[in-house]
Amino acid sequence: RDRHYIAYPKENVIKTWSEIKHAEKKPVTLWRYASTMLYFSGNEYYLTEFSSDWAKEAQMSTQPLLFGKKVIDTKLGSRAAMHTHPFFELGFEQPAQEAQGRAMLGTIGWTGNFQFTFEVDNVGNLRVIPAINPYASDYELKPNEVFTTPEFIFTFSNNGTGEASRNLHAWARNYQLKDGQGDRMTLLNNWENTYFKFNEELLAELMKEAKHLGVDMFLLDDGWFGNKHPRNSDNAGLGDWEVMRSKLPGGIPALVQSAKEAGVKFGIWIEPEMVNPKSELFEKHPDWAIQLPNRKTYYYRNQLVLDLSNPKVQDFVYLSL
């Protein structure tokens, strides 16, 4: 096993990962494979973690790390960060604070199931172990094949989490984000302003206000589609991607023209992988929605997921877009 480090002195950031290989005659199964292990000697450690849900993003909580193990993990797969963030803060001798005190910030470069383990031993030393979650993640490694773990990125600060977060911001702009140093487009989304209740005149006025604020793009959100089953609430219309004539008689071209006159770009929200049972699409093709036989159908926000493995569904989504 080889452990690798790359230091970014200007940003005060370190990136580390592990490579695992073997020379056995037959494949070896990997059951656990951490990106690294960091070891600290101190008197007190405080962990700050973040949890989320709809309308409850980034709920912060802090707790002391005492003897034993504390684990932050997720098993949600492609939705790994939905409830648990792959990010943490550590405070040394005191809870992590914005503008003072020793702090460490860390994150893992992995979009799937992850696991952070924090273990305080019997003499008060702390081990931090970031890794792919070992749950259902065994990997058969062939002889002389190299298995590379996700990268773990972390930074330290003697001046609180504010300085530490700016370290990571600078590192991301310089080394991680595409065009990180360039100007980034800003947009105004109408959702929190109007929800489903809008018309062409109101949207045109919002576009003018967006320009006045210095915003680059106006994004039209949910509620612009559906005729037989108008999308005036989240109960109907998903899947019927035709402009609602009663709400937007001029259609999308009229809105694009209003955006041009206001001097902003125009964007639009669409969720082509979802469908409401109360929609023309579902009435015509109920078999296109994913449902389990002999099970009561479960609805989340009154909608179902379309079966994108079905070529007919793929064609429908492509043509809709």
Report residues per predicted region.
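Terminal connector regions
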Residues: 154-185, 192
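Short coil/turn motifs at secondary-structure junctions
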Residues: 23, 156-157, 273-275
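Residues within well-ordered beta-strands of beta-sheet-rich folds
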Residues: 17-21, 148, 265, 269
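Polysaccharide-binding surfaces and accessory modules of carbohydrate-active proteins
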Residues: 1-119, 135
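Hydrophobic beta-strand core residues of beta-sandwich domains
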Residues: 8, 141, 246-249
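Short Pro-Gly-centered flexible turn/kink motifs
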Residues: 139-158
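Aromatic-lined carbohydrate-binding/catalytic grooves of carbohydrate-active enzymes
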Residues: 179-320
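Short acidic, Pro/Gly- and aromatic-enriched capping/linker segments at domain boundaries
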Residues: 122-142
